[in-house]
Design a protein with these regions (language model features):
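Conserved alpha/beta cores of soluble small-molecule-handling proteins
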Residues: 1-87
């Protein structure tokens, strides 16, 4: 993973959502993504559509990581989109 040193990294200008994963399913994924999109719009750092971030992309990440129970964290700043997971 490569992180660009932007205002999100240096000063916290960004938004994130931590989404519970239970039995391989993301809990309230649509609500989390709507809230994240509103935050990005408020911060004037784009939208999920402009970044190409979709429900499918998040679901695919969780499947690729073989995450069945835990959390998926999506962090977005002006220059970065970071997916993380924990069991």
């Amino acid at each position: 993973m490569e992180i660009t040193l932007d205002e999100g990294y240096s000063f916290g200008l960004g938004a994130f959502e931590t989404i519970a994963v239970k039995d391989g399913k993301l809990i309230f994924l649509d609500r989390h993504l709507r809230r994240l999109d509103r935050a990005l719009h408020f911060l004037k750092i784009g939208t999920l559509d402009e970044r190409g971030i979709t429900e499918k992309q998040v679901i695919d990440y969780v499947k690729q990581q073989k995450l069945t129970d835990g959390a998926c964290k999506l962090t977005v700043s002006k220059e970065n989109v970071v997916f993380q997971q924990r069991q």
